């Protein structure tokens, strides 16, 4: 159940990680992945002129804080933590989220 993955170490990724650590302190107890998928979107119309190499991220996270919440509510929790980075001109352009409870993660792993 303890899986950790990070495919980036840039300033935006470090900020994302810091904010998630504050908002979801239990994430370290479960599966977590932060991936910079920006390289897959070079030349994409939405990021033309953006000088940042960190625009598209994928977050896979398991937390007890998601228990009893529907998917949109879980997404809103993460969006609220990252709203400043998403509002910046050279900030996060796209965010793909996979947010599960420990029980959901365990049942999927079987």
Curated annotation (Swiss-Prot):
One of its GO terms (biological process) is [4Fe-4S] cluster assembly. InterPro entries: BolA, BolA-like_sf. Disruption phenotype: No visible phenotype. Cells lacking BOL1 and BOL3 display defects in a subset of mitochondrial [4Fe-4S] enzymes. It is found in: Mitochondrion matrix. Gene3D superfamilies: BolA-like (3.30.300.90). It holds the Pfam family BolA. It comes from the Eukaryota. Its main location: mitochondrion. Keywords: Mitochondrion. GO terms for cellular component: iron-sulfur cluster assembly complex; mitochondrial matrix; mitochondrion. Belongs to the BolA/IbaG family. Acts as a mitochondrial iron-sulfur (Fe-S) cluster assembly factor that facilitates [4Fe-4S] cluster insertion into a subset of mitochondrial proteins such as lipoyl synthase (LS) and succinate dehydrogenase (SDH). Required during the last step of iron-sulfur protein assembly when the iron-sulfur cluster is inserted into the target protein. Probably acts together with the monothiol glutaredoxin GRX5, earlier than BOL3 and NFU1 in the [4Fe-4S] cluster insertion process. Not required for [2Fe-2S] cluster insertion into mitochondrial proteins. Interacts with GRX5. This is BolA-like protein 1. It comes from Saccharomyces cerevisiae (strain ATCC 204508 / S288c). The gene is BOL1.
